Amino acid sequence: MIPNADADEKRPSFIRTFLGSSYGNTSDFGCWGSLSPDALYDVQSRVIGRICHAGPCVIVGRTADYIARELTNLFSVFIHSPEAHRARRIVMRNDAADEAEAIRIAKKADSKRESYYNYYTGRRWGAASNYHLSLDASMLSMEETVDLIISFLKARAAKM
């Protein structure tokens, strides 16, 4: 079964918006209504590649770590956290009425992300070996997590 192309993120329209605003005519990529999940992934991969080659950028999800794997300046991060922590954050964002619903939402999203990532990369989603840094978001505040990632990037850049 081919995973749904939007399984990786909630807002798959980014690629369409980017193509429309950045490239004007999207006819090079075919008619949107006729794109299969594999064709959409191919378009997405080309767009991500162009963005990565244009200069520093941050791309969340979309198998960007795999798409940009040949770039020497790539830095990939996987952020995870225990189910209870994720459920509380989902409820705090008002995306679920209670923690039980939030856990169902998180599990469904993870299942889709895992299927999508594994299918298109041949790798195992979430495996620490696929990323330069893997962090448990429940261990630090969001600000501390950001600071840690920035510190890691600065230390890495100093060695390059």
Where on the chain are the PLM-derived regions?
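ATP-dependent small-molecule kinase phosphotransfer cores
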Residues: 1-56
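Small-molecule kinase domains that catalyze NTP-dependent phosphoryl transfer to phosphate-bearing small molecules
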Residues: 2-24, 98-143
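Short N-terminal helix-initiation segments at or just after the protein's N-terminus
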Residues: 2-3, 17-25, 72-83, 154
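A short glycine-/small-residue-rich loop at the edge of a beta-strand within enzyme catalytic domains
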Residues: 35, 39, 77, 81, ...
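Short gly/ser/thr-rich secondary-structure transition/capping motifs
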Residues: 38-42, 57-61, 114-119
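ATP-dependent NMP and nucleoside kinases share a basic, alpha-helical "lid"
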Residues: 43-95
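Long, contiguous binding/interaction regions
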Residues: 62, 66, 80-84, 90, ...
